[in-house]
Amino acid sequence: MSSIPISTEGYDRLMKELERLKSERPAIIQAIKEAREEGDLKENAGYDAARERQGMLEARISYIESRMAQFNVINLDSLSGDKVMFGATVEIEDLDSGEAKRYTLLGPDEADYAQGTISVLSPVARALLGKEEGDEIVVDAPRGRISYEIISVAFEGARR
């Protein structure tokens, strides 16, 4: 079993989600019970909906609990250096278009492209890991090979 990096903030967020999901269990069980009391389960939309919700809830709980044992929790406030690694915020420039992008490299359970966070397992992050400001990388993307220059590497700590 390999370890999965996650920030302290990301771990805390998942723990809160797990607590919330577990607190929803009694209400779903009650909804199933009430729907079952309505009679014929074959044509009972309320029962079907409650069972489906229960299935999704239990699947998410199971997923989070199984990941917990694999997490390597990393305090972003303790990170520093010149090389790109987990927790780094990196600004890169597309050498063809001149377009600049800024990403923070976090664990797969924290990646949110819209928020500027990418998984350390993504192709871009894998190409960046271990590199420094001024280095060039090449990423194989659906539209072809893209060359980037690393403009800056920073460690900004936890995002509050």
UniProtKB/Swiss-Prot annotation:
Question: GO annotations under biological process?
Answer: DNA-templated transcription elongation; regulation of DNA-templated transcription elongation
Q: Which GO terms describe its molecular function?
A: DNA binding; RNA polymerase binding
Q: Which PANTHER family match?
A: TRANSCRIPTION ELONGATION FACTOR GREA
Protein name (Swiss-Prot/TrEMBL): Transcription elongation factor GreA
Query: Keyword Transcription, does the record have it?
Result: yes
**What's the stated role of this polypeptide?**
Necessary for efficient RNA polymerase transcription elongation past template-encoded arresting sites. The arresting sites in DNA have the property of trapping a certain fraction of elongating RNA polymerases that pass through, resulting in locked ternary complexes. Cleavage of the nascent transcript by cleavage factors such as GreA or GreB allows the resumption of elongation from the new 3'terminus. GreA releases sequences of 2 to 3 nucleotides.
Identify the HAMAP family for this entry: GreA_GreB
Q: Which residues form a coiled coil?
A: 11-38
Give the gene name: greA
